[in-house]
């Protein structure tokens, strides 16, 4: 089981590796830059060398960078498009520099017509990401709750992937809280299997690479993005157990993004999930 959490790399990647180990994680996700804006931290070559050794010792895999919330792949305004294009391009290279496997992004919001927004997402990914010569991290588009003009249903992601020509370098990251808020009832094994069947039919399971494992503070089908601690939300322990024991969902790399006061609380959630895995 590959299970970890969203951790900071502000004090250096080797320290993040040590933190992951201390909470019982064998994978982690991090923001590629300040999630609310600002310049990216430059990672020195010596730090990258130390990181590679620390990662090897800790058996951390996979590593996922997450683009900041200020990125909007569906932006209509030219200034916002330029910013998003720059961040997607530059942060792809930054994740590649530390040998990260995945780069996760919210698909974004549309302005005006929904299809026009989806088409802008396709164009921006082509220009800023697919233009980069491999190897590099696989871009994973995240399933979203569907707040307002937010893009991120399974049908949306299918449209984007089809528009891109189904490239091997673009895939999907699920989010249990977002899916629940979007109307997918994951509280039972049958509900989880219904989701898996939909993914198999429209996306292809080989393209689904990771999941953000979060409980939901928002009700089923509410289209509100509100995370809760593991077992403390609408999914509850029973729902989290259904997800982690699903033959497909439970074998994905799982990243916690739950509201915690400190990283030690992530450790408590990881221990709980490991117990639920055997239920």
UniProtKB/Swiss-Prot annotation:
Disulfide bonds: none
Keywords assigned: DNA damage, DNA repair, Endonuclease, Hydrolase, Metal-binding, Nuclease, Zinc
Co-factor: note: Binds 3 Zn(2+) ions.
Transmembrane spans: none
E.C. designation(s): 3.1.21.2
Keyword Zinc in annotation: yes
Top-rank taxon: Bacteria
InterPro entries attached to this UniProt entry: AP_endonuc_2, AP_endonuc_F2_Zn_BS, Xyl_isomerase-like_sf, Xyl_isomerase-like_TIM-brl
Record's keyword annotation contains 4Fe-4S: no
CDD domains xrefs: AP2Ec
Any one GO MF annotation of this record: phosphoric diester hydrolase activity
Residues that, per the record, bind Zn(2+) 1: 66, 106, 142
Binding site for Zn(2+) 2: 142, 175, 212, 257
Catalysed conversion reaction: Endonucleolytic cleavage to 5'-phosphooligonucleotide end-products
Cofactor(s) it depends on: Zn(2+)
EC class of the enzyme, as a word: hydrolase
Residues binding Zn(2+) 3, per UniProt: 178, 225, 227
Swiss-Prot/TrEMBL GO biological process terms: base-excision repair
PROSITE patterns, per database record: AP_NUCLEASE_F2_3 (PS00731), AP_NUCLEASE_F2_4 (PS51432)
Family named by the database record: Belongs to the AP endonuclease 2 family.
PANTHER family assigned: APURINIC-APYRIMIDINIC ENDONUCLEASE (PTHR21445:SF0), ENDONUCLEASE IV ENDODEOXYRIBONUCLEASE IV (PTHR21445)
NCBIfam families: nfo (TIGR00587)
Known role: Endonuclease IV plays a role in DNA repair. It cleaves phosphodiester bonds at apurinic or apyrimidinic (AP) sites, generating a 3'-hydroxyl group and a 5'-terminal sugar phosphate.
Name of the molecule in the record: Probable endonuclease 4
Source organism of this protein record: Moorella thermoacetica (strain ATCC 39073 / JCM 9320)
Classification lineage: Bacteria, Bacillati, Bacillota, Clostridia, Moorellales
